[in-house]
Amino acid sequence: MESTQQMVSSIINTSFEAAVVAATSTLELMGIQYDYNEVFTRVKSKFDYVMDDSGVKNNLLGKAITIDQALNGKFGSAIRNRNWMTDSKTVAKLDEDVNKLRMTLSSKGIDQKMRVLNACFSVKRIPGKSSSIIKCTRLMKDKIERGEVEVDDSYVDEKMEIDTIDWKSRYDQLEKRFESLKQRVNEKYNTWVQKAKKVNENMYSLQNVISQQQNQIADLQQYCNKLEADLQGKFSSLVSSVEWYLRSMELPDDVKNDIEQQLNSIDLINPINAIDDIESLIRNLIQDYDRTFLMLKGLLKQCNYEYAYE
């Protein structure tokens, strides 16, 4: 029969489940998001390590096995355990282990005062209330009976004096810091406002300049359009006048046609092109006049005539 061993195993497993529940509930109360599987794995690893490394699990299971053997009529193990527990070497070993535990607690910052207070008192929470009940343990009762408890009023007064805080002084300091910060913020804000006003003024001035320049450009564009229209009209009237004058001349028809073609080729829409065309026409006329003059000059020489300009 292994009922005791099964009970011990159940208690150990229940302790592990309680540790997992305590860890997850603490994380939930603190508002920390967690992965249940990760918490379960970490707690199990730490729990198994502590139970195995400290020997607590093997100790509990060993005692459970001894109890089961005694229940089954095998008292040899129980007798050995009884003899071992009453042996002076065992007692010395237990004292040594206790001393090691005390030194370990001291190295972790848990001094004698804290250990004694934890051993003498326990705190009981009252459901639904913020207050608690302080309970004295049997050790505290024994100390009172032995006269080992005293009331130190000086310690209480000294502690109260140390914990006293001059809230008015702190409030004044915070108020001064707040006023100083408020002044700096106001100065920076006023500086930013001035800079923003200056930027707006510069922007409005630039907009006015741009508007004036746009008006001037519009006026110049209108003037250029009028000038271009006037030039187009002048060139058109010039071509018409030259054509009319050409028809009144006693020139051969082929010469008239050639000159008319050159006049009709003048671009009356673009004044720049029109000027180039007129220049080309004038050059051609001068060239024709020059050829005619050379022909006349040669003819006079062949006839033994001389010519002179008057």
Swiss-Prot record:
Residues 163-234 form a coiled coil. Residues 167-231 are annotated as: Interaction with host ZC3H7B. GO terms for molecular function: RNA binding. Residues 205-310 are annotated as: Interaction with host EIF4G1. It comes from the Viruses. It is found in: Host cytoplasm. Homodimer. Interacts (via the coiled-coil region) with host ZC3H7B (via LD motif). Interacts with host EIF4G1. This is Non-structural protein 3.
